[in-house]
Amino acid sequence: MQFKNVALAASVAALSATASAEGYTPGEPWSTLTPTGSISCGAAEYTTTFGIAVQAITSSKAKRDVISQIGDGQVQATSAATAQATDSQAQATTTATPTSSEKISSSASKTSTNATSSSCATPSLKDSSCKNSGTLELTLKDGVLTDAKGRIGSIVANRQFQFDGPPPQAGAIYAAGWSITEDGYLALGDSDVFYQCLSGNFYNLYDQNVAEQCSAIHLEAVSLVDC
């Protein structure tokens, strides 16, 4: 396993839970809020805790640090691993220098994951990252993504990726249908492409390109270790 020591950051950003004409209505079942498609050989279960790191979709495969999370569930992408803001949004800062990264390899081992087909290789997380109190720590079960506080990973009404509840916030579009690809990327439905959109000195994460300052990324699943 290749070890990468990455910086983690967290910042506070608020997002109101407003109802939407489409999406989740409080009191209704939310586990059926899934995209219509699914990615080939995506593993809908990974019970070992993992983090996610932003990897730019470029020829050099430059990767940021792991994503962090602030106290209310916001996910933040720094130039290192992903953090989580206190209000549940996923965000990333812009200060760290991107580092090159090898593509995550696949493995036949099935100790911690459950692939959708017996003919599919199970994802093996090749990269590791140091974790701290702001690191976004995840588990995946039956296509539902949860953080260390048990909140549900969802795409909310403005297409932003964040954690709430359970249940997810009113108007949420997707709250299930997550998987990890054979290459080790987080996927939602049939897509493993997400978007980071610059907001001040950090990036918010979305499932669609919502503005000119957004760029396409992969979210690489990484092992988390105490350093």
From Swiss-Prot:
<dbReference type="InterPro" id="IPR000420">
    <property type="entry name" value="Yeast_PIR_rpt"/>
</dbReference>
<feature type="site" description="Cleavage; by KEX2">
    <location>
        <begin position="64"/>
        <end position="65"/>
    </location>
</feature>
<dbReference type="GO" id="GO:0031505">
    <property type="term" value="P:fungal-type cell wall organization"/>
</dbReference>
<dbReference type="GO" id="GO:0005886">
    <property type="term" value="C:plasma membrane"/>
</dbReference>
<feature type="glycosylation site" description="N-linked (GlcNAc...) asparagine">
    <location>
        <position position="114"/>
    </location>
</feature>
<feature type="glycosylation site" description="O-linked (Man) serine">
    <location>
        <position position="117"/>
    </location>
</feature>
<feature type="glycosylation site" description="O-linked (Man) serine">
    <location>
        <position position="118"/>
    </location>
</feature>
<keyword id="KW-0134">Cell wall</keyword>
<feature type="glycosylation site" description="O-linked (Man) serine">
    <location>
        <position position="112"/>
    </location>
</feature>
<dbReference type="InterPro" id="IPR054508">
    <property type="entry name" value="PIR1-like_C"/>
</dbReference>
<feature type="signal peptide">
    <location>
        <begin position="1"/>
        <end position="21"/>
    </location>
</feature>
<feature type="propeptide">
    <location>
        <begin position="22"/>
        <end position="64"/>
    </location>
</feature>
<dbReference type="GO" id="GO:0005576">
    <property type="term" value="C:extracellular region"/>
</dbReference>
<dbReference type="GO" id="GO:0000324">
    <property type="term" value="C:fungal-type vacuole"/>
</dbReference>
<keyword id="KW-0961">Cell wall biogenesis/degradation</keyword>
<comment type="function">
    <text>Component of the outer cell wall layer. Required for stability of the cell wall and for optimal growth. Required for resistance against several antifungal and cell wall-perturbing agents.</text>
</comment>
<keyword id="KW-0964">Secreted</keyword>
<dbReference type="GO" id="GO:0005199">
    <property type="term" value="F:structural constituent of cell wall"/>
</dbReference>
<feature type="glycosylation site" description="O-linked (Man) threonine">
    <location>
        <position position="116"/>
    </location>
</feature>
<dbReference type="Pfam" id="PF00399">
    <property type="entry name" value="PIR"/>
</dbReference>
<feature type="site" description="Covalent attachment to cell wall glycan">
    <location>
        <position position="74"/>
    </location>
</feature>
<feature type="compositionally biased region" description="Low complexity">
    <location>
        <begin position="83"/>
        <end position="124"/>
    </location>
</feature>
<feature type="glycosylation site" description="O-linked (Man) serine">
    <location>
        <position position="107"/>
    </location>
</feature>
<feature type="repeat" description="PIR1/2/3">
    <location>
        <begin position="65"/>
        <end position="78"/>
    </location>
</feature>
<feature type="glycosylation site" description="O-linked (Man) threonine">
    <location>
        <position position="78"/>
    </location>
</feature>
<dbReference type="GO" id="GO:0005783">
    <property type="term" value="C:endoplasmic reticulum"/>
</dbReference>
<feature type="glycosylation site" description="O-linked (Man) serine">
    <location>
        <position position="109"/>
    </location>
</feature>
<dbReference type="InterPro" id="IPR051153">
    <property type="entry name" value="Yeast_CWMannoprotein_PIR"/>
</dbReference>
<feature type="glycosylation site" description="O-linked (Man) serine">
    <location>
        <position position="106"/>
    </location>
</feature>
<dbReference type="GO" id="GO:0005934">
    <property type="term" value="C:cellular bud tip"/>
</dbReference>
<feature type="glycosylation site" description="O-linked (Man) serine">
    <location>
        <position position="68"/>
    </location>
</feature>
<keyword id="KW-0165">Cleavage on pair of basic residues</keyword>
<comment type="similarity">
    <text>Belongs to the PIR protein family.</text>
</comment>
<keyword id="KW-0677">Repeat</keyword>
<dbReference type="GO" id="GO:0071944">
    <property type="term" value="C:cell periphery"/>
</dbReference>
<dbReference type="Pfam" id="PF22799">
    <property type="entry name" value="PIR1-like_C"/>
</dbReference>
<protein>
    <recommendedName>
        <fullName>Cell wall mannoprotein CIS3</fullName>
    </recommendedName>
</protein>
<keyword id="KW-0732">Signal</keyword>
<keyword id="KW-0325">Glycoprotein</keyword>
<feature type="glycosylation site" description="O-linked (Man) threonine">
    <location>
        <position position="113"/>
    </location>
</feature>
<dbReference type="GO" id="GO:0009277">
    <property type="term" value="C:fungal-type cell wall"/>
</dbReference>
<feature type="glycosylation site" description="O-linked (Man) serine">
    <location>
        <position position="105"/>
    </location>
</feature>
